[in-house]
Regions:
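Hinge/cleft segment of the Venus flytrap/periplasmic-binding protein
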Residues: 3, 143, 162-166, 254-290
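Short beta-strand elements in bilobed, periplasmic/extracellular small-molecule ligand-binding domains
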Residues: 28-45, 139-142, 163-183, 227, ...
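Extracytoplasmic "Venus flytrap"
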Residues: 4-23, 27, 35-54, 69-74, ...
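Hydrophobic alpha-helical segments within soluble ligand-binding/sensing domains
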Residues: 47, 112-140, 182, 235-240, ...
Length: 290
């Protein structure tokens, strides 16, 4: 197999996904390996088709490794198993999946791993930011990612654990990591009669794009709520951090890119045979740091 790595991402419209693609290419250039980045237009079926195309390629045309960020990783177990059985490394980005350990046992010489942010810690950081903003408690409008995404559920888990026994009440609304989906989700919730029973004092969003979408819906339908403090996550320099600096967000959380460390692990395996650990966890950080 050639020294080539394919990075499969879900959507170029999601800021963090775009960052992963850029960082993967930069890491490939640094290490002297070919890196091909593909986006699946937020379409799970298309992503599976793209990945199978590489798995079923001729032996000399297959990549050495596939690095995959997917909306719901459990749905890719069959692709992962076929890839690993063909000798192709498989590394999940910013999430993990139950099948990783099983594939490592079945094919111990192949790189099967996950490089992910500590999503539970993201929830804990949001809890600390909430405590500084609203020390006496709050009604929290919480915009979560897709219900089936492990990253979304772990972030909520961390927040709920950190807030347990304290005077904070959550109203969870699910969206799809994008501004448009959050705007639609919040608008739909506001049209429900039950929304009148919950008067939020703060809005917490699992990424900065959804914070923008949620704010857009509130500005249009409940302009008095649009002035509430917002918390986000991802913290890109021209995204969430800029929103904090210019006052649109009260705070955000900066996430490291998983792509560059994953490229490092894949290249080490390709060149030395050293199998990476099953799980590499990267630490998020609050922005601003105080």
């Amino acid at each position: 197999m050639a020294e080539r790595i394919v990075v499969s991402l879900t959507s170029a419209d999601q800021e963090y996904q775009a960052l992963q693609g850029e960082n993967a290419r930069e890491a490939g250039g640094r290490l002297g390996v070919e890196v091909e980045v593909l986006f699946a237009k937020d379409n799970g079926v298309l992503q599976i088709q793209q990945l199978f195309r590489f798995v079923h390629a001729g032996e000399g045309e297959r990549p050495a490794a596939l690095l995959v960020h997917t909306r719901v990783p459990d749905g890719l177990e069959r692709v992962a198993r076929n890839a690993v059985q063909a000798g192709i490394g498989w590394i999940l980005l910013n999430r993990t999946a139950p099948y990783v350990d099983a594939l490592r046992r079945e094919c111990p010489a192949i790189a099967v791993a996950a490089v992910t942010t500590d999503h539970v810690e993201i929830g804990r950081i949001h809890a600390r930011q909430l405590a500084r903003l609203c020390p006496d408690g709050a009604l929290v409008l919480y915009v979560q990612g897709p219900a089936g995404a492990s990253a979304a559920s772990l972030r909520l888990q961390g927040l709920e654990e950190a807030l347990r026994g304290r005077p904070y009440e959550l109203k969870v609304v699910n969206a799809e990591w994008t501004a448009a989906s959050a705007e639609k989700a919040i608008a739909g919730w506001l049209r429900l009669r039950t929304s009148d029973l919950f008067q939020p004092t703060v809005v917490v969003c699992q990424n900065d794009l959804m914070a923008r979408g949620a704010r857009a819906a509130l500005e249009r339908l409940r302009p008095d709520w649009a002035r509430l403090p917002f918390l986000g996550c991802d913290g890109l320099p021209k995204g969430g951090r800029l929103d904090v600096d210019e006052g649109r967000l009260a705070a955000t959380i900066t996430l490291p890119s998983c792509a560059s460390p994953a490229i490092d692990l894949a290249v080490k395996w390709m060149r030395t045979g050293g199998v990476p650990p099953a799980l590499t966890v990267l630490a998020p950080s609050a922005y601003p740091a105080r």
